[in-house]
Amino acid sequence: MVKVVATNKKAYTDYEILETYEAGIVLTGTEVKSLRNGSVNFKDSFCRFKNGELYLLNLHIPPYSHGGVYNHDPERPRKLLLHKRELKRLMGKVQEEGVTIVPLKIYFNDRGIAKVEIAVARGKKKYDKREAIKKREMERKIREYMKYSR
């Protein structure tokens, strides 16, 4: 049973999702406990390559309430764990103009291990967002009309 801790809803509105990957994440003990409490903030978080490794930046995991002196830095860069071939493929995709890697959700898998779903994404323009909203509204109105016309 997968337990989703948090979803990055803003990523779905601001980006066009091209491809998704599941990645492990290197966390300290207090970060895991804080995640199990369900507290995490995706605001402005993104992924970058550094020395051939992928890091998740600006992900805010607040300090654990019972952590004491050994608590973690809430904004520290966190290393993502992927297979070498996946890292090479991602590195190639990021070289393209306007393409970035964003986190979509954090969850605990069946074995209780924290995972991050990341996506290769392209930023949407303002008019693309408006079109998506119009399309969603029209579909909603059509469903509503069909529901009441029976």
From Swiss-Prot:
PANTHER family (UniProt xref): SSRA-BINDING PROTEIN (PTHR30308:SF2), TMRNA-BINDING COMPONENT OF TRANS-TRANSLATION TAGGING COMPLEX (PTHR30308)
GO biological process: trans-translation
Compartment(s) where it occurs, according to its Swiss-Prot or TrEMBL record: Cytoplasm
Main location: cytoplasm
GO molecular function: RNA binding
Gene3D superfamilies hit by this protein: 2.40.280.10
Gene this chain is encoded by: smpB
GO cellular component assignments: cytosol
NCBIfam families: PRK05422.1 (NF003843), smpB (TIGR00086)
High-level lineage: Bacteria, Thermotogati, Thermotogota, Thermotogae, Thermotogales
Protein name in the entry: SsrA-binding protein
Family: Belongs to the SmpB family.
Role this protein plays: Required for rescue of stalled ribosomes mediated by trans-translation. Binds to transfer-messenger RNA (tmRNA), required for stable association of tmRNA with ribosomes. tmRNA and SmpB together mimic tRNA shape, replacing the anticodon stem-loop with SmpB. tmRNA is encoded by the ssrA gene; the 2 termini fold to resemble tRNA(Ala) and it encodes a 'tag peptide', a short internal open reading frame. During trans-translation Ala-aminoacylated tmRNA acts like a tRNA, entering the A-site of stalled ribosomes, displacing the stalled mRNA.
Keywords noted in UniProt: Cytoplasm, RNA-binding
